[in-house]
Amino acid sequence: AILIALVFGALPLSSPNVSMKEVAKRVGPMWAYAQVGMLLQWALVGLFGLYVIKLIWPDLNDAFGIMLPTGFYGGHGTAAAIGSAFEGLGWDEARSLGMTTATVGVICSIIGGLLMVKWAAKHKQTAFISDFDDLPDELRSGLLPEDKRDSIGEATTSSISIDTLTFHVALVFVVAFLGYMVSQTVKVYYPVLELPVFSCAFIIGLVLKKFFDATTISRYICPQTTQRLSSSFTDMLVACGVASIKLGVIVKYALPLIVLIIAGVAIVWCITFFLGRRLAKTFWFERMIFAWGWWTGTMAMGIALLRIVDPKLSSKAMDDYAMAYLPIAPIEILLITFVPILFVNGLGVWLLLACLVLSLLILLLAWKMGWWITRS
């Protein structure tokens, strides 16, 4: 969580000035894409578990199906939270199932993401890389030849007082810390509205960027340096995300779990690919591959896949997701809070149907707003 806050806290400081009207126009379709993607994953996979898997294995818990979106979309943290809630309500295996789907989701995000990147590069659907098999040597080896090396920034402070790199690192940490404080403050006064730290850090970064631009402070902030810092934090985030993978085997539920995972991967792929082509006017594949990594594994996996097809993050996919996630966070928190209670009381199907109906309403709004795009 700290590294994610640092990544998104540094983004606004390295972004060029754009009008809020332009941002809102750009983020609207991304909000619809991300919100519908979350709701449909819960609804479709949950209903598949209730009305297909339960027919084959009737002794399974009604909430068995929703343990896949718990692990895929939510990740290990959400799996632990919902699993613990179910354990308190009498279903002891929930945590293990959630952790298993979260781990499998990370693996699927990497393997499936790389296959999609190769397909997109081959069919000229990527904006920043060419054929996957003909990538430049520097992208394959990770080492730049002398004639292709860029400056990582310029000195804006005297090393007698403070080193430039230290100054910029401290600035990013301040942004992330303020984002954390805002998130915790909201949590104290409005416990249900638990805003993620990274979104708060991004908003704080935007506010400070406006303040810096209105004064002379921005003259001493190097965009290249903050961009490199964001990339460095991203590298550490990816490494920590991969290192945190915990492999587990649940023998008791092996067969239904395999069926659930196969069906879940297919459903999530259809949602990600179909909606990604129709709710992104620009850089549709870059936005879609980031969503795939996030919705099956973790945000770190999404960032890793995005950096393969967009090494310099020129598509602004991460910026847009940070803004779009703000109105999504409360709905996600409500799901995490009420899913165990509703399923234990036999009302889970109504929750899943509500997610499905809300998804259709958002898609209708996207069509009315002109966000829906028809691609061949």
Language-model features, listed with the residues they occupy:
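Structural signature of multi-pass alpha-helical membrane transport proteins
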Residues: 1, 11-19, 149-157, 166-228
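Interfacial helix-loop-helix linkers and transmembrane-helix boundary segments
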Residues: 14-33, 213-227, 244-258, 280-284, ...
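C-terminal transmembrane helix pair
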Residues: 240, 247, 257, 261-371
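Intrinsically disordered, low-complexity non-transmembrane regions of multi-pass membrane transporters
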Residues: 121-166, 213-217, 371-376
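Interfacial loop-to-helix junctions that mark the boundaries of transmembrane helices
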Residues: 1, 92-101, 186-198, 221-227, ...
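Structural signature of hydrophobic alpha-helical transmembrane segments
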Residues: 1-7, 62-69, 192-204, 229, ...
